[in-house]
Structures are given as structure tokens and as C-alpha cells.
Amino acid sequence: MAELRALVAVKRVIDFAVKIRVKPDKSGVVTDGVKHSMNPFCEIAVEEAVRLKEKKLVKEIIAVSCGPPQCQETIRTALAMGADRGIHVEVPGAEAENLGPLQVARVLAKLAEKEKVDLLFLGKQAIDDDCNQTGQMTAGLLDWPQGTFASQVTLEGDKVKVEREIDGGLETIRLKLPAVVTADLRLNEPRYATLPNIMKAKKKKIEVIKAGDLGVDLTSKVSVISVEEPPQRLAGVKVETTEDLVAKLKEVGRI
């Protein structure tokens, strides 16, 4: 049991507290000079892997991120939380903006095979695109069982029991290892990295590779046509009678 190895995917996203601004040309959102941090659901995935290691159920945790050089900051955060080493799949800025779930899933699948891991943890979704697809696609490419929206994870020999949130309740499933698990909000509360661990993380190894080294083509067949802010919500108007209501609706062209 103690020989299990876990790969945890972490994504660098605009910090959840930042007000998003759309670029003037509507090609995307403004990222220059904007605070970034680890995707909150990825933090939960890292925390769960670390807890399993603390129980001596996992031997090694590898944190991986795809994107520009700044992604190494996100990997360092995972290392400070308790991951053992990192892998940075370097993708240039312009190409990184077009990375979709399928491209990342291909990278993760190759790394999972290369590193011979038993568990692949991801956040259930990222707060920037909210796709909720990468974990499922990775499991499909690997032909591994998957436990998505996990709210509880328990290792049982060569299986992992996952309690997952579904519409109207909870579902409990058992997956034969190796398996893919995506973390939901209620799985755990991630720890804050302590200063000593932050200092230790600076000495931990981060391997830098390119997608081509894995034989992965990052070309996307999906392109963003336009990104727009939601329309501003207009203030309501109080009316005294039904007749006034009908007149107002006619005035604004609703009837």
C-alpha cells in the first residue's frame, strides 16, 4: 500500500478575488499585471493527496502544471503544501491561452503512464473556464475508472472508495487502481503552507519538459470567437396599478 504514487494536476488561474476585465478587442480577459494563484479545486486535490501520504498510504506525490514559466509558482505552492516534486510542461504564452481540456488531458495521460502512478488527482473544474472535462477526458484516454465530484476518498487495498456528490444526494463507488479522482468543494479544507515548508519547497525539484517530449500535439480545434461581459442589470421600476404595469411593459417593448 505504501508504494502508491499520486500525480496531482494544478492549474494557474486568475485569483478568485480579482475582478475580471475583458480585453478591448474581446479576444479574452486581461491577464497582464493581474494576481494569479492556484485553482481552488486543485488546492483541494493537492491537500487530499498530502493527507493520504501523511497516513502512509501514498509514497510519492508529483505536482504537474501546463503553461508558461509562471506556472512554476503554482507548482511551488503545491510543493510547499506537501508534494514531493514537480513537473512543468512548458507551453508558450500564446499557445497556453488556447489550451483546452483535451490538450491538457493528453499531457496528463502521457505523464501518468510515464511516471507509473496509481492515482491521478484533479480539481473537478477550474474557476476560469469552468469546463469540468479534463478529469473525465484523462480517464477516457487512459481507460482508467474515474470518481468525479469526490467528497470523500478512502483507500482500500487495491481499490479506492469514492463518495461523490450527485443531484439529490451522495453516491458511493469503488474503483480498482489505477484511477482518476476529481475533487469537489467538500472533500477537505486545504492547509496554508507554512514558512518553513515554503523555504523547503524552493529546494524541491521541478522538471521542465515540453509537450513534444511526450509526443503530444497541443493543437486545438476549438477557438474563442468573442468574450464579452454580461449585460448590466437595469434597476426596476415600481408601479401602482395593473394598468401602469401593462403600459410600462409596452413602453420597453416587452409586450
Curated annotation (Swiss-Prot):
The modification N6-methyllysine is found at residue 200. The modification N6-acetyllysine is found at residues 200, 210, 238, 248. This is Electron transfer flavoprotein subunit beta. The modification Phosphoserine is found at residues 223, 226. It comes from Rattus norvegicus. The modification N-acetylalanine is found at residue 2. AMP binds at residues 9, 39-42, 66, 123-134. InterPro entries: ET-Flavoprotein_bsu_CS (IPR000049), ETF_a/b_N (IPR014730), ETF_b (IPR012255), ETF_beta_N (IPR033948), Rossmann-like_a/b/a_fold (IPR014729). Heterodimeric electron transfer flavoprotein that accepts electrons from several mitochondrial dehydrogenases, including acyl-CoA dehydrogenases, glutaryl-CoA and sarcosine dehydrogenase. It transfers the electrons to the main mitochondrial respiratory chain via ETF-ubiquinone oxidoreductase. Required for normal mitochondrial fatty acid oxidation and normal amino acid metabolism. ETFB binds an AMP molecule that probably has a purely structural role. The keyword Protease does not apply. The modification N6-succinyllysine is found at residues 210, 248.
